[in-house]
Each structure stands twice: as structure tokens, then as C-alpha cells.
């Protein structure tokens, strides 16, 4: 029996389902990215960070003025879970040390990892 996904609130849950429908797939790569985008973004911001037509992350848009330290950590983790993203200059920022431990969202970060690796977690 699979555990129920933990959401921050009803808005997080609704946005997660909206984003999953928008990308038309719900696999182990997509779910954690949509989960983390839903945690931190509204639909227009999620579109800045993820190309739903091409089904790819948009790291070129990472430095948006609306980013907070928590949203930046969530999106960095989403990108890492998508494809191991870090560029050479962002490698240190994407370390476990720099993503976890600074945010009240850590429990949601763990939830995203569970979505990505359901048979391991």
C-alpha cells in the first residue's frame, strides 16, 4: 500500500494536480518536479521554470526576481531530481548541505524524494 502524499496545504495539493494534468504524465521523474513547483510557484511561475510543451526544465530562467531562498532550494532540488541538473558553477548550491536544513519545507523536500524513488523510500 502506497502512503498518501503529504502536502503543505490545499493550494499545494490543487496546484500539484493542475501541473500534473498540464504535463500529461505522472511518472517518477515528473511527479517530484511538479510537487516542488506546486509548493513554491503559481501556474505562471511554474511555466517559467518548466517547459510543459517540450517537457523539460528551464534552468535559464532560474534567477527570477520572485525567487526566495526557500523557493530557490525547492526548485534546485526539483531540477536535481529531474535530471541531476547542476552545472559546474551550481554544483555546490545543489548539495544536500545547501538544500536541506534552512527551510521549514524540508519535510516536503523529503516527500519529493519519496515520489522520485518510491521503491527505495
Protein language model regions, located:
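Extended, charge-biased low-complexity segments
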Residues: 1-68, 76, 83-121
Amino acid at each position: 500500500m502506497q502512503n498518501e502524499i503529504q502536502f503543505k496545504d490545499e493550494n499545494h495539493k490543487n496546484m500539484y494536480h493542475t501541473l500534473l494534468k498540464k504535463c500529461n504524465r505522472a511518472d517518477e521523474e515528473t511527479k517530484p518536479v511538479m510537487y516542488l513547483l506546486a509548493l513554491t510557484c503559481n501556474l505562471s511561475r511554474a511555466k517559467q521554470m518548466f517547459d510543459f510543451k517540450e517537457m523539460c526544465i528551464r534552468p535559464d530562467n532560474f534567477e527570477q526576481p520572485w525567487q526566495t531562498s526557500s523557493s530557490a532550494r525547492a526548485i534546485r532540488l526539483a531540477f536535481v531530481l529531474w535530471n541531476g541538473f547542476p552545472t559546474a558553477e551550481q554544483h555546490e548550491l545543489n548539495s544536500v548541505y545547501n538544500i536541506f536544513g534552512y527551510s521549514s519545507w524540508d519535510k516536503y523536500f523529503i516527500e519529493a524524494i519519496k515520489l522520485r524513488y518510491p521503491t527505495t523510500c
